[in-house]
């Protein structure tokens, strides 16, 4: 750590009303503010595309200097904790702020771009908007993560000298450099690709997807070309195959793209199978490891339409193999199934948002920024939640078990009592440490095991009694259970 807690608090207190843009793109975004704080404190920068992924994209880096805490019912944040909001904020990008104070019901924090006014003037680099760092009061959400840095009591002269170098390096690394990017619509010429739901792969991608991705990337300052020119009249697969057949590894298809110095290549397709097959994924050469762009595009697919599988290495596709042969930064993305009605209904309705998010994945930051208070466009329905042994789905599709017993709080801060089985539900009171209640049912949802009971008021109430994993297995407990 390069500053003490007192120094960090002074910087934080003085940040109110100011603006921060360390990467010099799209004005004053929420991620910029958290990144500036992290750079000043540690000399390193947070990396990644979306705010909600900060704890996961930067896990090893953060844990060198502090800890990542997933919010739980009786957790109390501290001043200077970095709070990471889930993906339903910021149009799917999430949001991040820094805590000023907290109680068990709400917390107060400082942040940029909560109202989407951190970038308004239309200039990508560096961009400008009137919204400054402002104070907000928030309820807790689920999932919500807090990053707590371990500040020292004092910093040595040597560490101070290192801080100047590390902060300068971090700021330099934060700047996003323009790239030369080639976007390739799959199929072409006399090959329409897959057909389904009133359209074909070749025409749909050329009309709705590649031009919009190009629009947003150009807005971000990148040099972008569409394969085959503005009409996208060529098929890169057929062109590459011709180059292979005639032994010309310079003038056709992906060889031509390489010879013209493109830094990044994205080829876009729609998948096809039975009507029930759903979701997208990214394909790369088995000779490469997935890079940040591959993972970020995969995240866009997963968090919006849904994924059928993760980033997939292959060695049986022509352009994939040629990309390894000539060492070019290439991936093929299947954005969803043209043969699945739900997939195509979602893509047709949200093609501009989808394109913008994919462009942001390539750019390395959400393009144009997003209003934190807006909930993202709804994804299509997902599969039923996992049902642990002994539970059944109730009428609301929530795993429930008829169970009676006693629960005794074993947490000095007590357990929040709510009017529903979600950390978004209203807190109606706090069950103090060592208090015991008789319960008559249990739920497993939203990352917690909940119990329910009738309070003295005659109203049904709910308590989160511990965390569970994705399969519903208990991994922590806030109290003790006993049978009746």
UniProtKB/Swiss-Prot annotation:
Under the heading Pfam families, the entry gives:
Amidase_3, CHAP, SH3_5
Q: Where is the SH3b domain?
A: 402-472
Q: What GO CC annotations are associated with the protein?
A: outer membrane-bounded periplasmic space
Instruction: Tell me the Gene Ontology biological-process terms attached to this UniProt entry.
Output: cell wall organization; defense response to bacterium; FtsZ-dependent cytokinesis; killing of cells of another organism; peptidoglycan catabolic process
Q: Which Gene3D superfamilies match?
A: endopeptidase domain like (from Nostoc punctiforme), SH3 Domains, Zn-dependent exopeptidases
Q: Which catalytic reaction applies to this protein?
A: Hydrolyzes the link between N-acetylmuramoyl residues and L-amino acid residues in certain cell-wall glycopeptides
Q: What is its EC number?
A: 3.5.1.28
Key words of the record: Antimicrobial, Bacteriolytic enzyme, Cell wall biogenesis/degradation, Hydrolase
Q: Does the keyword Cell wall biogenesis/degradation apply?
A: yes
- Record's keyword annotation contains Mitochondrion: no
**Any one GO MF annotation of this record:** N-acetylmuramoyl-L-alanine amidase activity
Coiled coil regions, renumbered to chain: none
Q: Show where the MurNAc-LAA domain sits.
A: 181-363
Q: What does this protein do?
A: Has weak lytic activity toward S.aureus cells. Full-length protein has no activity, but fusion of the Peptidase C51 domain to the lysostaphin SH3 cell wall binding domain yields an active chimeric enzyme, suggesting that PH may be functional.
InterPro entries linked to this entry = CHAP_dom, MurNAc-LAA_cat, N-acetylmuramoyl_amidase_3, Papain-like_cys_pep_sf, SH3-like_bac-type
Q: Which PANTHER family match?
A: AUTOLYSIN PH-RELATED, N-ACETYLMURAMOYL-L-ALANINE AMIDASE
Protein name, per record: Probable autolysin PH
Query: Any idea where the Peptidase C51 domain is?
Result: 5-148
Organism (species): Staphylococcus aureus (strain NCTC 8325 / PS 47)
Q: Which PROSITE patterns match?
A: CHAP
């Amino acid at each position: 750590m390069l500053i003490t807690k007192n120094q960090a608090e002074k910087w934080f207190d003085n940040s109110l009303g100011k603006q921060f843009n360390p990467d010099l793109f799209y004005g004053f975004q929420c991620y910029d503010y958290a990144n500036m704080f992290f750079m000043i404190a540690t000399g390193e920068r947070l990396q990644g595309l979306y705010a909600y992924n900060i704890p996961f994209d930067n896990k090893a880096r953060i844990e060198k200097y502090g800890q990542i805490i997933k919010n739980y019912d009786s957790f109390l944040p501290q001043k200077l904790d970095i709070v990471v909001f889930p993906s339903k904020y910021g149009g799917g990008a999430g949001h991040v702020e820094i805590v000023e104070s907290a109680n068990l019901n709400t917390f107060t924090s400082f942040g940029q771009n909560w109202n989407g006014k951190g970038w308004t003037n239309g200039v990508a680099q560096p961009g400008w908007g009137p919204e400054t760092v402002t104070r907000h009061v928030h309820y807790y959400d689920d999932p919500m993560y807090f990053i707590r840095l371990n500040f020292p009591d004092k910093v040595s002269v040597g560490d101070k000298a290192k801080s100047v170098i590390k902060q300068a390096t971090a700021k330099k690394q934060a700047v996003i450099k323009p790239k030369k990017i080639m976007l390739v619509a799959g199929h072409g010429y006399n090959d329409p690709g897959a057909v389904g739901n009133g359209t074909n792969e070749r025409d749909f991608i050329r009309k709705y997807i590649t031009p919009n991705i190009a629009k947003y990337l150009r807005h971000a300052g990148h040099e972008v070309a569409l394969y085959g020119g503005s009409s996208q009249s060529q098929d890169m697969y057929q062109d590459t195959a011709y180059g292979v057949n005639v032994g010309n590894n310079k003038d056709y298809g992906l060889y031509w793209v390489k010879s013209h110095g493109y830094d990044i290549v994205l080829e876009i397709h729609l998948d096809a199978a039975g009507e029930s097959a759903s979701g997208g994924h990214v394909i790369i050469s088995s000779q490469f490891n997935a890079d940040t762009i591959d993972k970020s595009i995969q995240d866009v697919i997963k968090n919006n339409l849904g994924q059928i599988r993760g980033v997939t290495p292959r060695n049986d596709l022509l352009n994939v193999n040629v990309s390894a042969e000539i060492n070019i930064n290439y991936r093929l993305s299947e954005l969803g199934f043209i043969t699945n009605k739900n997939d195509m209904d979602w893509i047709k309705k949200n093609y501009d948002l989808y394109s913008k998010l994919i462009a942001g994945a390539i750019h390395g930051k959400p393009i144009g920024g997003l209003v934190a208070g807006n909930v993202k466009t709804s994804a299509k329905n997902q599969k039923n939640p996992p049902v642990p042994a002994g539970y059944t789905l109730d009428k609301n599709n929530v795993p429930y078990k008829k169970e009676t017993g006693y629960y005794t709080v074993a947490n000095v801060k007590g357990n929040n009592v709510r009017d529903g089985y979600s950390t978004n539900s209203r807190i109606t009171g706090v069950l103090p440490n060592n208090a015991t209640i008789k319960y008559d049912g249990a739920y497993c949802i939203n990352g917690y095991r909940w119990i329910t009971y009738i309070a003295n008021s005659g109203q049904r109430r709910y308590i989160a009694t511990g965390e569970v994993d994705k399969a519903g297995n208990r991994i922590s407990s806030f109290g003790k259970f006993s049978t009746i």
